[in-house]
Amino acid sequence: MKAVVLTLAVLFLTGSQARHFWQQDEPQSPWDRVKDLATVYVDAVKDGGRDYVAQFEASALGKQLNLKLLDNWDSLSGTVAKLREQIGPVTQEFWDNLEKETEALRQEMSKDLEEVKQKVQPYLDEFQKKWHEEVELYRQKVAPLGTELREGARQKLQELQEKLTPLGEELRDRARTHVDALRAHLAPYSDQLRERLATRLQALKEGGSASLAEYHAKASEHLSALSEKAKPALEDLRQGLLPVLESFKVSLLAAVDEAAKKLNTQ
């Protein structure tokens, strides 16, 4: 069932993205897509759970226990929906603040990475070119041996392996040479990028200590607000479950007593 729900959810989300494309609307943010997926999944589970409850109450055991689960199901679903509505805005604000606080650092790092990429790209292209040349040379040397294998007999297999071994070692050694050369070319840029990152983080730590402390306080405040808003809804959910559990307990004890009486009379 979960696989079907997730499949429908994916179709729903991709369909919503296609609608934005054709109507030229603003695309959904990742957070909105996650919320849509969670909503579809929760609604599907809720509807499926209600069907299972209805089937159970219609069964012989359900009629005998008389739990009246279906009467409480809609109120529980409403409580869960209320909890989701209360938590949603607080969580959204928390992630928006996190993204806003790290925007400058992400932009600076993207700029540094793009600069390093432009500098090392020629070395990467040269390495790829040489590697393709080595592979092609190896293929040309091995191709006659493959033909010899197809045309020859099994007794020449050992001889063929002996011929392949030095060629493989030669390719490995030549590739190692190219890799070492590439590593030597890239080392200064790697060190430079690491130093820039350390500088950015140090500047953020020293110059933005006040903003970081403020953000920490805001994050704590948001989490505290989230906890406070969730408490009433969770309490409502607990109160909604109590009648169901109590009814189940009473009905189960009654069924056990009735079964014991029947056994005693037999």
Curated annotation (Swiss-Prot):
Subunit and partners: Homodimer. Interacts with APOA1BP and CLU. Component of a sperm activating protein complex (SPAP), consisting of APOA1, an immunoglobulin heavy chain, an immunoglobulin light chain and albumin. Interacts with NDRG1. Interacts with SCGB3A2. Interacts with NAXE and YJEFN3.
Modified residues (Methionine sulfoxide): 109
Family membership: Belongs to the apolipoprotein A1/A4/E family.
One GO cellular component term: high-density lipoprotein particle
Subcellular location, record wording: Secreted
Protein name stated in the entry: Apolipoprotein A-I
Alphabetized Pfam families for the sequence: Apolipoprotein
Post-translational modification, as annotated: Glycosylated.
This protein's encoding gene: APOA1
Sample GO molecular function, one term: protein homodimerization activity
Signal peptide range in chain numbering: 1-18
Gene3D superfamilies assigned to the protein according to its UniProt record, in alphabetical order: 1.20.5.20, 6.10.140.380, Apolipoprotein
Record keywords: Cholesterol metabolism, HDL, Lipid metabolism, Lipid transport, Lipoprotein, Oxidation, Palmitate, Phosphoprotein, Repeat, Secreted, Signal, Steroid metabolism, Sterol metabolism, Transport
Transmembrane segments: none
Gene Ontology process terms (BP): acylglycerol homeostasis; cholesterol efflux; cholesterol metabolic process; lipoprotein metabolic process; phospholipid efflux; positive regulation of cholesterol efflux; positive regulation of phagocytosis; positive regulation of phospholipid efflux
Sequence repeat coordinates: 67-88, 89-110, 111-121, 122-143, 144-165, 166-187, 188-209, 210-231, 232-242, 243-266
Described purpose of this protein according to its UniProt entry: Participates in the reverse transport of cholesterol from tissues to the liver for excretion by promoting cholesterol efflux from tissues and by acting as a cofactor for the lecithin cholesterol acyltransferase (LCAT). As part of the SPAP complex, activates spermatozoa motility.
Chief subcellular location: secreted
Protein source organism: Mustela putorius furo (European domestic ferret)
Lineage of the species this protein comes from: Eukaryota, Metazoa, Chordata, Craniata, Vertebrata
Matches recorded under InterPro entries: ApoA_E, Apolipoprotein_A1/A4/E
Region 10 X approximate tandem repeats: start-end pairs: 67-266
